[in-house]
Amino acid sequence: MAARALCMLGLVLALLSSSSAEEYVGLSANQCAVPAKDRVDCGYPHVTPKECNNRGCCFDSRIPGVPWCFKPLQEAECTF
């Protein structure tokens, strides 16, 4: 029974973490398609996706060691 509960908890945590990996509220995915090496930090340590988006920035935590909250591309810079 305890093993099943641990499996369920792991599944829930995995789903929650994957759903917040990239957030583009109010921005297009193209605006947030900034290569990791070109990201300009827009947040602060431990910024949440919601706080980042409220600043008008993109949030993507999939790549360690680079800013997760970063300035979006302007529409003219977007690569379609």
Curated annotation (Swiss-Prot):
Domain P-type positions: 30-73
Keyword terms: Cytoplasm, Disulfide bond, Extracellular matrix, Secreted, Signal
Signal peptide stretch: 1-21
Subcellular location: Secreted, Extracellular space, Extracellular matrix; Cytoplasm
Highest rank taxon of the organism: Eukaryota
Keyword Cytoplasm attached: yes
Entry GO terms, CC: extracellular region; extracellular space; secretory granule
Tissue spec. comment: Expressed in goblet cells of the intestines and colon (at protein level). Expressed by goblet cells of small and large intestinal epithelia and also by the uterus. Also expressed in the hypothalamus where it is detected in paraventricular, periventricular and supraoptic nuclei (at protein level).
Example GO molecular function: identical protein binding
Cross-referenced PROSITE patterns: P_TREFOIL_1, P_TREFOIL_2
Entry annotated with the keyword RNA-binding: no
Cysteines paired by S-S bonds: C32-C58, C42-C57, C52-C69
One GO BP: regulation of glucose metabolic process
Quaternary structure, from the entry: Monomer. Homodimer; disulfide-linked.
Primary role: Involved in the maintenance and repair of the intestinal mucosa. Promotes the mobility of epithelial cells in healing processes (motogen).
Name the record gives this protein: Trefoil factor 3
Species annotation: Homo sapiens
